[in-house]
Amino acid sequence: MNTKELIASELASIIDSLDQEAILKLLETPKNSEMGDIAFPAFSLAKVERKAPQMIAAELAEKMNSQAFEKVVATGPYVNFFLDKSTISAQVLQAVTTEKEHYADQNIGKQENVVIDMSSPNIAKPFSIGHLRSTVIGDSLSHIFQKIGYQTVKVNHLGDWGKQFGMLIVAYKKWGDEEAVKAHPIDELLKLYVRINAEAENDPSLDEEAREWFRKLENGDEEALALWQWFRDESLVEFNRLYNELKVEFDSYNGEAFYNDKMDAVVDILSEKGLLLESEGAQVVNLEKYGIEHPALIKKSDGATLYITRDLAAALYRKNEYQFAKSIYVVGQEQSAHFKQLKAVLQEMGYDWSDDITHVPFGLVTKEGKKLSTRKGNVILLEPTVAEAVSRAKVQIEAKNPELENKDQVAHAVGVGAIKFYDLKTDRTNGYDFDLEAMVSFEGETGPYVQYAYARIQSILRKADFKPETAGNYSLNDTESWEIIKLIQDFPRIINRAADNFEPSIIAKFAISLAQSFNKYYAHTRILDESPERDSRLALSYATAVVLKEALRLLGVEAPEKM
């Protein structure tokens, strides 16, 4: 039980009109620590108690009694709690030194499944920085949900079907070179894709030709299928190399094509339930009662099925296959209307589990303020970007620690971690401007800054040859260590908030705060000097390292022992 829960529990025992959960939501952290560690505002009780909030606060303060509090005072309408530093620090250090990386593990999920639809790049197109957001947010959410007791299923819903394959087949047949594609598949296919789009703007017949080839593909034409399979296989080899670089794994690569034979069943169910209406020759589902103006277009007038039909088939398949408790789609915010339609159609079909589906949108990555576009060839490709980040990290590591043995390995962890961390520290729904120099900096709110704080602590622990005792009698009561203790104690709640809001940035910001607090402590405290507090200071350093490493792991970022 953390201190906020303890305070809420104590207050609930003497307040009749509010339960523990309601009290917990009202608790605040005073901006000035001189006003206490936690405050309870008594305003909400004034109406029920028919007393002034100041009087209520004074009465509550008088009744509070626990050894976890140094003192409890009423200041105006607030009850201010000053926690007993020695007691709380002893509890926190005991918990972390005993539980180690399992500190803050929870069993909220009871091993139920969370399906995460993430990454999902388009076949035959390069893996750009735009795809990175879905990949790293999804991967981090997977770690976060596992930490609180869920099992996760990471699905890479590949964009491996659609008219773009008609375009690619036409381009390849006109200008393609088999050897060049084999040597550099994505580069060559991108050149072909950009070229056919540029030429189609002046020559509409190319569009018609592409549609014709896609029709052939849908009808199982041998040549079209062979080219499609080849484009898919070559792209996947390249994608998997990048996923290995990012240390991201998937449980399923079932993409759009996987659902080709599963969509008719969806149309049949909609038809049987009387949900399909005809509109200008097309078949649609009316969703006005859900406040959605545009109907869901299920089948076009030429009989072709649409994106939503495929996603309905995927949702039904995943529910049947994984019996999920939650199904999360980590997809850009421009798809918000689509996912509202998807949930509404599933609701119309009578599936209560549509409530368990969540669209987790995210903002755009720009370069110098400009939007990125594959079609126009204006992209930041991930592979050369990772190589550049690793190279920049290595230069800084060589300057800081020329004797370091495994420089390349550490530079890779720092370079890749820098890109991931920068993305994840940004509030998910905000975009950000891609700035490699800022990402790889060891100063400021960056991944390398947090990694370096962790490596510095490991260096201190090695010098002291410190091994924590699970029954160690550790406790501290100074102001600098108290800031760190409060953060470490808050870690379980931070993880819950990140899960509840599908927001890894909560953990990234926490990691920055913890690293900053420790660096401040390190600057003011002679940790290694002989003193009665030496072991407790080392235990605090150890606990900080454990929590920093775990916070980074939840973001999919490595924590090198030396830097």
Curated annotation (Swiss-Prot):
One of its GO terms (biological process) is arginyl-tRNA aminoacylation. A motif ('HIGH' region) lies at residues 121-131. It is an enzyme of class 6 (ligase). Its main location: cytoplasm. Keywords: Aminoacyl-tRNA synthetase, ATP-binding, Cytoplasm, Ligase, Nucleotide-binding, Protein biosynthesis. One of its GO terms (cellular component) is cytoplasm. The keyword Aminoacyl-tRNA synthetase applies. Its EC number is 6.1.1.19. It catalyses: tRNA(Arg) + L-arginine + ATP = L-arginyl-tRNA(Arg) + AMP + diphosphate. It is found in: Cytoplasm. It holds the Pfam family Arg_tRNA_synt_N. GO terms for molecular function: arginine-tRNA ligase activity; ATP binding. Monomer. NCBIfam families: argS. Belongs to the class-I aminoacyl-tRNA synthetase family. This is Arginine--tRNA ligase.
